[in-house]
Design a protein with these regions (language model features):
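N-terminal anchoring/stem segment of glycosyltransferases
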Residues: 1-57, 61-66, 197-225
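ER/Golgi luminal nucleotide-sugar-dependent glycosyltransferases, focusing on the catalytic module
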Residues: 48-50, 87, 93-121, 180-183, ...
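GT-A fold catalytic core of metal-dependent nucleotide-sugar glycosyltransferases
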Residues: 51-105
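Aromatic-acidic/polar surface patches that form glycan- and anion
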Residues: 15-22, 48-52, 115-121, 151-158
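Catalytic core and acceptor-binding pocket of nucleotide-sugar-dependent glycosyltransferases
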Residues: 123-210
Length: 225
């Protein structure tokens, strides 16, 4: 039976050049894997939470008619030769070096809210089936005031909220981690072998930094995008 899937991206504000390029690239990928595509704009999940927190909209009832929902940052790109259907791949989100560090940090800072025993996913990519989305949504039964603890730029934000909801929903971390290739930073080796490339400002893991558009253009010039 053919699955009914959708790929989402989110942005709050006026789209920049790289955002538009990412949208076009991901729309092309969505067409290849037979998924719908939609850009979510503004602050539909909560008008008082930061822009990244709006990714929580992916678990709302408006998407219940879809089997899988994939949420991608708006600086993610599929390489030219990447033909793998992510909807056939196991996992929900990223849990690599950065996420492991942030997981430790959120548990240290919020020991009554966070836990080492439940999953923590990076915010650049989430892939959730309907049962998980409904479970997370159903766990959001209390006042949303606790979400304000993560309502600061670069302070857990959507990652922190999803982590707490995963705890309350009793989500087992086993099998929820995506292969790192599905969110490979642009400065890492062999970007042509990535599932999705996450365009960053760094040129190498150690730096220096430059505009993301320059790093995007370097990937285009190399024939990867």
């Amino acid at each position: 039976m053919t699955k009914n899937n959708i790929i989402l991206q989110h942005f709050d504000g006026e789209l920049r050049e790289l955002d538009k390029l990412s949208m076009a690239n991901i729309q092309e990928y969505a067409q290849m894997v037979g998924a719908e595509y939609r850009l979510i704009t503004g602050k539909p999940f909560s008008p008082v939470l930061t822009a990244p927190c709006q990714k929580l909209q992916m678990i709302q009832p408006e998407f219940d008619r879809y089997d899988d929902v994939l949420m991608l940052d708006i600086d993610m790109f599929a390489p030219k030769d990447m033909k793998i259907n992510i909807f056939n791949e196991p996992g929900v989100g990223m849990y690599h070096t950065t996420q492991k560090m942030l997981h430790r940090k959120i548990v240290q800072q919020y020991p009554l809210l966070a836990s080492n025993n439940y999953p923590y996913w990076g915010g650049a990519i989430y892939k959730m089936g309907k049962s998980l989305r409904v479970a997370l949504r159903s766990a959001d039964t209390m006042s949303k005031e606790w979400m304000n603890r993560f309502n600061k730029p670069y302070h857990f934000e959507d990652e922190g909220i999803f982590h707490v909801l995963a705890i309350r929903a009793g989500v087992n971390w086993r099998g929820t981690f995506l292969d790192p290739k599905w969110c490979q930073c642009s400065f890492l080796p062999n970007p042509q072998d990535a599932g999705f490339i996450h365009v960053r400002t760094k040129i190498t893991p150690q730096g220096p930094k430059r505009e993301k558009m320059e790093n995007y253009q370097a990937l285009v010039d190399a024939g990867i995008l």
